[in-house]
Amino acid sequence: MKTQHNDEMQWIHHIPQYYDTFLIVKPGFLKRSHIILEAFCNAGYKVVKQTQKELSYIEAEDLYIMHRDKDFFAELCTYMASGFSRGYILKSPYIGENYTINETNKLKNYFRKCYAQDDMRNVLHTSDNFINLRREVEIYFLGEADVLCQEDKFKEGYIAKAMNVDKH
């Protein structure tokens, strides 16, 4: 960020703030989760918490509620409830919700190109906004969304408060 002081432009350096993002490695792809996670960590993401879970059909419906009226909804829910998936809460080194989502999507799309079997069995799901993130985290980490997704209003989006993270 630049500030004006005595007609000189000076740079102010800030401690990086981390935005919470949520990643799901979908059923059938858990054997690749270490490769996927390593790529995210190499890009500066930090693992806050992870879990492996077999979703019920109802939980899958809650996860993809935004697609409720689409033709593929029932098939997607059946697929997501077909086996274990792994959920990761990550801290992103990027400032701002939109920038974080764009950077996360780049990695997601790379892995989809490498490993996807079809449009539905496409390896990864990532949260596309803070509201969905909180709902999705609650599905995987029941009762912990308020603790894990602490929010502050910052410019165009929400950024999670910087916190100590453990790398798993």
Predicted feature descriptions by range:
Residues 1-168:
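Non-catalytic terminal and connector segments of soluble metabolic enzymes
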